């Protein structure tokens, strides 16, 4: 039996992403030459799956087979479980943690301009998408939140570099030239005094 078929069988049976280390252990492979065969087999499987309803993707914890997004409505009919609906506040909180980690609840509140409800943080922790990394060394020692590998896996990302890029904010002076005059005037006045 060829290694590609064995890897595909493992991926089909797995209920989690499988890493190269997992493949080496399960296939009882120890040499670097055989490890390159694993990588080559994965590459070939990825090519084969390009024209199928599922694909082989690399996520933070390894590789997994998943149904392509365009089939999600059909697949959803198999389960009666309704998908988790996240509130705007929950999505904003998760986004802030993903983009600006590690952050405290206070940091999130400063950015959002409103209080973060306890149930929002609890939901994100219960889903396994965020965790406490440590505590900021300030009075009160607030918890520092970061995203987890489960967050990356559930949102089909290999790492946080896969997050969409945030739009760059324009320079305020480009928006209003009067601001440049005011800033320049203030600077001159300060130097003269």
Residue ranges and their predicted role:
Residues 56-57, 62-66, 137-148:
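Minor-groove-contacting beta-hairpin "wing" of winged helix-turn-helix DNA-binding domains
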Residues 46-57, 128-137:
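A short, conserved structural fragment
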Residues 8-12, 16, 83-103:
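Short amphipathic alpha-helical interface segments
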Residues 1-8, 65-91:
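Short alpha-helical segments that sit at the start of domains
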Residues 2-3, 153-193:
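Phosphate-centric recognition/catalysis
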Residues 18-26, 100-111:
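Short acidic, hydrophobic short linear motifs in intrinsically disordered regions
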Residues 1-44:
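Short Lys/Arg-rich amphipathic alpha-helical segments
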Residues 33-41, 112-126, 139-142, 173:
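Short amphipathic alpha-helical interaction segments
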